[in-house]
Swiss-Prot record:
It holds the Pfam family Urease_beta. The lineage of its organism: Bacteria, Bacillati, Cyanobacteriota, Cyanophyceae, Synechococcales. This is Urease subunit beta. It is an enzyme of class 3 (hydrolase). It comes from Prochlorococcus marinus (strain NATL2A). The gene is ureB. InterPro entries: Urease_beta-like, Urease_betasu_sf, Urease_subunit.
């Protein structure tokens, strides 16, 4: 007899492919500030800390292509490439740094 543990997850065998078939954008990002900057998986990358230097136009409506609930940390002086994926669904961007607060469909 097997016993279930409250909250236990029993996944199927195999791998889960994240953002399968989604278009990605690769950007070179540099932390030009004197402090570490961390960006979460679903943060609107366009509105990230001004201490990060990258092509912001290419990041509009996109988030990091990393597993949900994780983040990327940029130490002062760090430079690396990141992959971004477009937001899905209604593509409404509200909050963050308040730069958009509207639908991207317009």
């Amino acid at each position: 007899m097997s016993y279930l543990i409250p909250g236990e997850l029993i996944p199927e065998d195999g791998f889960i492919e994240l953002n399968k078939g989604r278009e990605t954008t690769t950007l070179k990002v540099a932390n030009t500030s004197d402090r570490p900057i961390q960006i979460g998986s679903h943060y609107h990358f366009f509105e990230s800390n001004k201490g990060l230097e990258f092509d912001r136009k290419k990041s509009l409506g996109k988030r990091l292509d990393i597993p949900a609930g994780t983040a990327i940390r940029f130490e002062p002086g760090d430079q690396r490439e990141v992959n971004l994926v477009p937001y899905a669904g209604d593509r409404k961007i509200f909050g963050f740094n308040g730069l958009i607060n509207n639908s991207l469909q317009q």
